[in-house]
Design a protein with these regions (language model features):
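Conserved N-terminal catalytic core of the sugar/cofactor nucleotidyltransferase
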Residues: 1-5, 13-16, 26-27, 31-115, ...
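A structural signal for short hydrophobic beta-strand segments in well-ordered beta-sheet cores
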Residues: 25, 145-147, 211
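Conserved beta-strand termini and adjacent loop/short-helix elements that scaffold enzyme active sites
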Residues: 54, 76-78, 132, 212-215
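Conserved donor-nucleotide/metal-binding helix-loop-beta segment in metal-dependent transferases, i.e.
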Residues: 111-140
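Catalytic-core segments of class I nucleotidyltransferases/pyrophosphorylases
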Residues: 101, 118-121, 152-250
């Protein structure tokens, strides 16, 4: 099992700070944002991680380095944002043939993925996909789940104007090996305008998508200054953790 941490894009919601560094290197209380995202991946048991970044990938590599003992860290540069399919294909050589955890770096959460990851690792047959979701107050910003009367997932609508529910699926996903063929098919049909929801929908249609709900977990999209400030307050209160992470000589007590 391998992970892709997507940390590309311009970080336009974080200007002017992102003119000089990557948004994931901005401070979230006493650690950079990326440490919290990596911690969620690491706690799941995955030790092979590919990080996709923009022109500041060198700064990310300087901070993350070779990772923790026993880890394999790959770095991929997205020189210009050409869509999610382009970014993922840059990481493809490092992960194709493996089941993957796909993690978009703005998502800071206390959800623990260990059990779900282990189920995917241990499954002898293709396990489909696991969609990590939660109830949100602004469903227009997310891929939103559509349920039938029996609460069975039947569709996903990307950023709907009239949301059919408040259950958002976005930012963290777990996929079997068929992900890349599905990506190719969706790109062939929809081109650069495709979204992750389009890929997820292929799993939903065939009944191989499951939902993991973060009912009692914190989950913050740290892509805006206000959200980053909120997350910093939560981390200060001990409600968000960046452990395990690299602690170097000279770092603040942690």
């Amino acid at each position: 099992m391998k992970a892709i941490l997507v940390a590309g894009g311009h970080g336009s919601r974080m200007l002017p700070f992102t003119r000089y560094t990557h948004k994931t290197l901005l401070p979230l209380y006493n650690r950079p944002v990326i440490d919290y995202a990596l911690a969620t991946i690491r706690r799941s048991g995955i030790s092979d991680i590919t990080i996709i970044g923009n022109q500041f990938i060198g700064q990310i590599a300087q901070h993350v380095g070779t990772g923790l003992p026993g880890e394999t860290i790959h770095y991929v540069i997205e020189e210009e944002p050409l869509g999610v399919h382009h970014a993922l294909n840059l990481a493809r050589p490092h992960v194709e043939g493996s089941r993957i955890l796909l993690y978009f770096s703005d998502n800071i959460t206390t959800i623990e993925l260990t059990d779900t990851v282990q189920k995917f690792i241990n499954s002898k047959k293709a396990p489909g996909c696991a969609l990590i979701g939660r109830i949100v107050e602004d469903p227009e910003r997310f891929g939103i789940a559509v349920f039938d009367n029996n609460q069975k997932l039947i569709d996903i609508i990307e950023k709907p104007k009239n949301p059919p529910s408040s259950f958002a699926i976005g930012g963290i996903y777990i996929y079997d090996e068929s992900f890349w063929n599905r990506l190719d098919s969706v790109v062939a049909e929809k081109g650069a305008k495709m979204s992750i929801s389009d890929i997820n929908r292929t799993y939903v249609t065939e009944g191989s998508a499951s939902i993991v709900q973060s009912e009692d977990s914190l989950w913050i999209d740290c892509g805006t200054p206000d959200a980053l400030l909120e997350a910093s307050h939560l981390a200060e209160q001990g409600k968000l953790s960046a452990k395990p992470c690299n602690i170097r000589k000279g770092d603040e007590p942690f």
